[in-house]
């Protein structure tokens, strides 16, 4: 246990452990972790078991789509397996959350490629650390348009520049 939790002797070991586990999640600080822990403790046991099972099942069954690299519980995600989508147009996004944001607009009918990150030399994240290789393999197929929709951050712009200046695999 971390020092913060060692000083919280007023919590039982199990509550402290639950708080510590929640605080490991991104964006969850100590106060939020405490709120979540006490909320879970006050939930009916069936709901807690449902939550725990959903987490375990997702971790065991969710994997990368073999085509676009988004997260899915099938070999090929519903978007890539949809024959009504324009498979000749690929939009490159950084995360599955970015994909979901574009899908919510209902305006895009192509398919996606999820990089699962962006290039960040300052953080030691290079082209080999994101799913660029898979994208280059896809571009060897029948693709008419590549839409680069990385984030407007320095890392997203760096990634977009690399994609824009990379030679096409068909050249």
Which residues does each predicted region cover?
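Conserved small/polar residues in nucleotide/adenosyl-binding loops
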Residues: 1-8, 164-171
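Cys/His-rich Zn2+-binding cysteine-cluster or related metal-binding knuckle/ribbon modules and their
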Residues: 9-16, 24, 34-90, 95-99
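Extended interfacial segments that mediate partner engagement and assembly in macromolecular machines
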Residues: 33, 82-150
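Alpha-helix N-cap/helix-start motif
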Residues: 48, 124-125, 156-157
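Short amphipathic alpha-helical segments
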Residues: 104-105, 159-161
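Acidic, metal-coordinating catalytic cores used for nucleic-acid/nucleotide bond scission
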Residues: 150-160
